[in-house]
Structures are given as C-alpha cells and as structure tokens.
C-alpha cells in the first residue's frame, strides 16, 4: 500500500439525408448524432433540421482583466453550403500506443477546483438545510411513512444478509487491493480510475476492520526501506545521487510524504457516523430514481435539485458511453476522435475551465459583459449564441450560473442537458430529470452509496459491493481495450517490411515498373484541401516521461526541497481543514440538538493520530536533508538563489537532450507553449503539475493543449487564492464579533 504513494471534430462534410428510421423520443441521443451542427440528422425524430448558422462564425474570447478564457480548439462553425468531400476517418491521425511499463512518478495529481471530500459534502449539506430553515425556503421533506415493526426472524435474516455481503465485500476488496499493490511494486502506473478505486477500497477495509490501522500502517512504515530495496522501479531513477546518505534520506522523505497524503485522503474518504440516521436518504434516493426510470412519475423540484448534486463530473464522465462522449465533444467543439480516455480528458479539462470561468463571471457580473463576450460564454457552454437577443443571452447565462453556483448542479449534467437539445420551454428541473434518465445504471449505484456517506447513514454493504464490482468491470474493460489497441498497432506493421529490416537478409528484388493505362474520363481529381491536424506537434507518452525526468534532474541539480516543503504545508492545511470541518459539523448539528449523535469512526481517529506522527517525522527529515546539503556541496557563497524554482528554456531543452534525442522544432514548440508570458523562463513547479496531470492519463496531447492546461491551472490557482483569502477574512470577522 505504501507505494500508491507515488501518485502516481475537426472539419465536417455535407449533411446527407438519412434513410427512414424508427421514431425516437424528443431529446434522445442517437449514436450518429452530431451535436455541433443541427443540420446533421439523427438528433431527434425530425427528418429535416435547419442549420444554426449559414456563415462562418469565428470564436471570440471572454476576458476579465487579463484572464482569457481557455479554449481547446479554434475553428469556425460549419457552413451550410460549401463542402466538396465527405469527411473520413483517414483525414485525422489517431495515435495509439500499447501498454507502457513506466515508473510511478512521485507527483501529486492536480485536484480539480472545488473537489470536496465526504466530510466537506456533509458540512455543505447541513449548512444548506439550516440556511433554508432559517430563511423559510423550500426544504425537501420525505413523506411520512408508517414504520412497520419487523419480526425477530426478519431481523435475524437482515443481519445475516448484511454480514454475508460484508464478508464478500471484505474478500473482494482484499483481492483487488493486493492486485493493484503488486502492479505498483512492479513499476506499473495506476490510472486515475484505478487509483480512485484503490483509495475507496482502503477506506472500506479500514471501515470494516478498524483494527487494521494498528497492524497495517506501522508494518508499512517499518518495511518501507525493505520495499525500496526489493522494488527499485517503484521510484524513478532520477533519485540516484552521488551521496548515498542523501539518496536514502530523499527516498525516505518522498515515500513518507506520499504515504501521509494517501492516509489523509483515506481519512477524508471515510464518512462520519450518525447514530440518529434511519436510512431515509438511501430509501428516498432509490424511490426518486425509480420514479424517473420506471414509473414515469414526476418527482418534486426539491427532489430533483437535491439528488442532482450527487452526480459529480468525474462520476458522470467516467461512466458515459462512447456515443455520449462523442456527442459532448462535438457540442463543445472538441476533437471527437480518439480513445475514450482522451475524450474524457478533454471534457474534464474543459469542464474545469468552465467552472473557473463561472466564478469569474459571477464576480464581475453578467451585465458587465459585451455582446461578443456573452456569445462566447454561451457558446462555450453549449447554449445557443447566434440569432438571439442580448437579453436572451443574459437570461440563459444567468440561469446557468444560478444552477451551477447557487444550486451546485454539476457542470457535466448541465452540458449533457444541452446536448439533448431539449425544448426551451422545459423548466430547468424537467431538463435535469430528462438528463438523469439517460445516465447508465452504474452511475445510480455510485450515487446511492454517496448519498449514504454524505448523510452519515450506515452504508449498505450490498450496494457498496455492487458498485465496487461494476467499477472493477469497467477497469478490466479499459485494460482489454488497451491490449486490443496494442495488438492492432502491431498488426499495422507489414511482415515484409519487418523482414527486410533484419540484418544480413537481402531486401526484396526490385520489380520492373509497369505502366498503367489510365483513361482521361476515369481520372478523379480531389480539389479539397488536405486536413493535416496536429501532425508534428503531438506529445507522446514517452516524451512526457522524458520531460518528467528532465524536471527531476533540474530539481536535483538545484538541491531544491521547495516542492516537498509545499506538499508538506498542503498536507498540514488538509489536516487542519478536516479538524475544522468536524467542529463546524458539530456546531451546525447543535442548532437542532443532534450533535451528540454524530461521531468520527474509530479507524479515522487512529489514522489521524498516525498522520500527525508522520508529519513530525517528515519535518525532521527535511531538516536533516537541509543540514546534509549545507555540509556538502552548498557553501555560504553557493546558496540557492531566491528564485530557485524558475529555470530558463535553454536549461530545460539541454536537460531533455541529455536524456534522449527529440527533434529541435518539437522542443521549441513545447517550451514555447509552457512559457505563457514569453519571458524565456519557466516555473519548474508549475511544469511538474502539468506533467503530473497528463502523466496520470494514457493520452497524447498537442503543444496547444499543453498551453491551455497551463492557463486553466493558473485560473484555478488564482480563484483558490481568492477563496482562501475570503475565508480567512470571514473567520477573522467572526472571531472579532465573538
């Protein structure tokens, strides 16, 4: 377990009439739906749909005081007339790579803006309920049900069933955790989905058997030096230094830091226990989903708004089908060709950018935007932007911000509702209801477990088991698709070409040229321009790893522990925030006299104590390393300058050339994309965040997309700093008031 540690539609052809097909309900997503252009048939049961626009409309960009909107692609809307040839997959280049066995990088993945832990969601839910009660607004209250007393035999059967599913869950979790741990120890990289599954499984194991904290965690800490010796691939080779003592200390620091972060994430994943909870939230969610899926009965608006919050972006995107992913990419004008992981990565980054922009727009005010800015904002969110009045643009943007920021409806659900092209006359609640009907069954299972955790109710072992098995099946399916892509890539190599390249084997004898007789009337000339895409600017997985190694070497040369210190400070902030959230939850429950019923689990308390001990050990290791470096090569006159995390483009290019040869033009293109202010310098810590974000996904991106990722991360950091400053000011004001 200690090893998880290292956390680790371009151009389009003309519209053609489709053959007669069965009628489908309005708002349904067809596999052949092209949602970037309403001229394409198959969206609804209609046989002819007018184009949204007949002239090219180049995208405009929304800017707030020098903070531009990032955009993945820049292309005009399709035209209603000019099209000489039909688009074919051959016009786009799809790069497929096989499985790569790479060392797990010691970098923490960038967390999306606003991603909350279970305890933070519980706190938000309590605050929302109390606020509505104080304001006298509508609060969801389930219908009163007559409590039926169970017989003794029924109670015994329920308990036996509960423990049966609990032991099954424990056995399956243990098998999955052991398999993932073995993959990590052998140098394999866990995907984002696998890491999330591993984190949840560890939280389940500690929840089911709290005594494991006393056995597993100290045992892991004791065996860390042995594991590092037996499994050298667990750490990147760039940890090798001239000083054996310094190398040992750095490895120990890296592993302890990542282990402490992982344990803190596990603590935050474990829900609180509410002794007064009667399981109503789980039953209410089951009844709600049964209404919209089976009976056809319309739930109340309060139910729809309440349960829609559970379908978070990550949960929704990870379980959408490929036709739905393609439809969303086309709606948001993203590349719709590639693997499912690539499409999800594109959508995730776009949704993160939209979420950051929503907060900026809300801060500046919708009324302060110009018409072009309103059109750009609406178009980026999949809403109609052309041929409507300014008041209409402001109205639909204000409605979006109200649903997203005030009602906390996930961005993925809002985008998916736009992709279905539902009538504008439908209310937001009805649009969300229609959207929830299209989600796969696995999403409902995950949301059912989540609602129990947020409300502090007893988690149903059967529901948890079903969700775990479904997620494991999805992970295995991804592995099969990866192997299939690798085998197809091997088949593309012609056997004759492979044999001709063998040493000592003569090549094929040249055949005499044969002139073909071509009749003039049979010659077909294609006058359409060739779509080149991003050829020459793609960044492969191997090049990402080379860039990662170069950053590690540069950090080693600078003898910098800035990254470790920053991660330790973030870990301390997480621990403090967790403690403050616990106190706030008890404070909110004290308003209704229920604070005595809420308690932290025994495993969570034990893990918290262990994390506090590890933080003290990490502080000691950092102090020891700094002392070693000062006693070694770094003297008083050779101290590291103030801007130690800033490197020049020339340094980065030289470091990458030392590892492996990369074409000069690609190096220049990549470094230019990373240098957003064009001053010739790059912050190596920011570069590490981008590498870590891309390295966790098995995708290949372009240098343009790298620049957009940098812009998105910068926006998120600015917003996070503003929110922290605002929270600090509110706390100080509350302390002064008290």
From Swiss-Prot:
Keyword Acetylation in annotation: yes
Mitochondrial intermembrane side: 115-207
Any Pfam family the entry gives: LETM1_RBD
Protein's GO biological process: calcium export from the mitochondrion; cristae formation; inner mitochondrial membrane organization; mitochondrial calcium ion homeostasis; mitochondrial calcium ion transmembrane transport; mitochondrial potassium ion transmembrane transport; negative regulation of mitochondrial calcium ion concentration; protein hexamerization
One GO term describing the cellular component: mitochondrial inner membrane
PTM remark: PINK1-mediated phosphorylation at Thr-191, positively regulates its mitochondrial calcium transport activity.
Keyword Secreted: no
UniProt region (Disordered), positions on chain: 719-738
Major place of residence: mitochondrion
Keywords tagged on the record: Acetylation, Antiport, Calcium, Calcium transport, Coiled coil, Ion transport, Membrane, Metal-binding, Mitochondrion, Mitochondrion inner membrane, Phosphoprotein, Potassium, Potassium transport, Transit peptide, Transmembrane, Transmembrane helix, Transport
Gene3D superfamilies associated with the record: EF-hand (1.10.238.10)
Protein family per UniProt: Belongs to the LETM1 family.
Subunit structure: Homohexamer. Interacts with BCS1L. Interacts with GHITM.
Name under which the protein is recorded: Mitochondrial proton/calcium exchanger protein
The organism's taxonomic lineage, starting at the top: Eukaryota, Metazoa, Chordata, Craniata, Vertebrata
Protein encoded by which gene: Letm1
């Amino acid at each position: 377990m200690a090893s998880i540690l290292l956390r680790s539609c371009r151009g389009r052809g003309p519209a053609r009439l489709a053959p007669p097909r069965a009628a489908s309900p309005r708002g349904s997503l067809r596999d052949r739906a092209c949602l970037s252009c309403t001229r394409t048939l198959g969206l609804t049961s209609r046989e002819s749909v007018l184009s949204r626009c007949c002239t090219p409309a180049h995208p405009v960009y929304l800017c707030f005081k020098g903070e531009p909107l990032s955009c993945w692609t820049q292309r005009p809307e399709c035209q209603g007339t000019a099209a000489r040839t039909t688009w074919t997959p051959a016009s786009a280049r799809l790069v497929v790579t096989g499985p790569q066995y790479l060392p797990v990088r010691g970098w923490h993945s960038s967390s999306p803006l606003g991603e909350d832990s279970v305890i933070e969601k519980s706190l938000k839910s309590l605050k929302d309920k109390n606020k509505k009660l104080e304001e006298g607004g509508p609060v969801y209250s389930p219908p009163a049900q007559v409590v039926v007393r169970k017989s003794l035999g029924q109670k015994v059967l329920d308990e036996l069933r509960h423990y049966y599913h609990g032991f099954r869950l424990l056995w399956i979790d243990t098998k999955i955790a052991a398999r993932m741990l073995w993959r990590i120890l052998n140098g394999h990289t866990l995907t984002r989905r696998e890491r999330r599954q591993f984190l949840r499984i560890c939280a389940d194991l500690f929840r089911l058997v709290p005594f494991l904290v006393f056995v597993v965690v100290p045992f892991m800490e004791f065996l860390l030096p042995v594991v590092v010796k037996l499994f050298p691939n667990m750490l990147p080779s760039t940890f090798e230094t001239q000083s054996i003592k310094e190398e040992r200390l750095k490895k120990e620091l890296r592993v302890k830091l990542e282990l402490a972060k992982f344990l803190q994430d596990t603590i935050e994943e474990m829900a609180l226990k509410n002794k007064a909870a009667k399981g109503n939230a789980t039953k209410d969610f089951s009844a709600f989903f049964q209404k919209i899926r089976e009976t056809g009965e319309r739930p109340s608006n309060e139910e729809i708004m309440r349960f829609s919050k559970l379908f978070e972006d990550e949960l929704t995107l990870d379980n959408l089908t490929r036709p739905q992913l393609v439809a969303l990419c086309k709606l948001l004008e993203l590349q719709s060709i590639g693997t499912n992981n690539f499409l999800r990565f594109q959508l995730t980054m776009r949704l993160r950018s939209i979420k950051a922009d929503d907060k900026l727009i809300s801060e500046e005010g919708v009324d302060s935007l110009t018409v072009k800015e309103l059109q750009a904002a609406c178009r980026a969110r999949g809403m109609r932007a052309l041929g409507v009045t300014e008041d209409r643009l402001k109205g639909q943007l204000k409605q979006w911000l109200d649903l997203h920021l005030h009602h906390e409806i996930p961005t993925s659900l809002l985008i998916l509702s736009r992709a279905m092209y539902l009538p504008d006359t439908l209310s937001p609640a009805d649009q969300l209801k229609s959207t929830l009907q299209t989600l796969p069954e696995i999403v409902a299972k995950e949301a059912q477990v989540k609602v129990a955790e947020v409300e502090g109710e007893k988690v149903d072992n059967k529901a948890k088991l079903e969700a775990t098995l479904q997620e494991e099946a999805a992970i295995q399916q991804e592995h099969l698709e990866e192997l299939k892509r690798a085998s197809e890539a091997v088949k593309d190599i012609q056997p004759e070409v492979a044999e001709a390249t063998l040493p000592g084997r003569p090549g094929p004898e040249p055949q005499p040229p044969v002139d073909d007789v071509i009749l003039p009337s049979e010659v077909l000339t294609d006058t359409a321009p060739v779509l080149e895409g991003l050829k020459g600017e793609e960044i492969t997985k191997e090049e990402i790893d080379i860039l990662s190694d170069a950053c590690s070497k540069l950090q080693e040369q600078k003898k910098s522990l800035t990254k470790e210190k920053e991660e330790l400070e973030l870990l301390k902030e997480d621990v403090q925030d967790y403690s403050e959230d616990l106190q706030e939850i008890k404070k909110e429950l004290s308003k209704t006299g229920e604070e005595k019923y809420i308690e932290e689990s025994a495993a969570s308390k034990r893990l918290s104590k262990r994390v506090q001990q590890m933080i003290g050990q990490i502080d000691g290791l950092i102090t020891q390393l700094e002392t070693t470096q000062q006693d070694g090569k770094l003297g008083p006159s050779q101290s590291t300058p103030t801007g130690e995390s800033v490197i020049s483009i020339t340094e980065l290019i030289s470091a990458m050339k030392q590892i492996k040869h990369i074409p000069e033009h690609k190096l220049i293109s990549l470094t230019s994309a990373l240098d957003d202010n064009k001053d010739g310098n790059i912050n190596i810590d920011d570069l590490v965040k981008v590498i870590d974000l891309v390295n966790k996904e098995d995708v290949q991106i372009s240098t343009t997309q790298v620049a957009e990722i940098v812009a998105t991360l910068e926006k998120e950091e600015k917003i996070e700093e503003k929110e922290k400053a605002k929270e600090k000011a509110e706390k100080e004001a509350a302390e002064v008031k008290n």
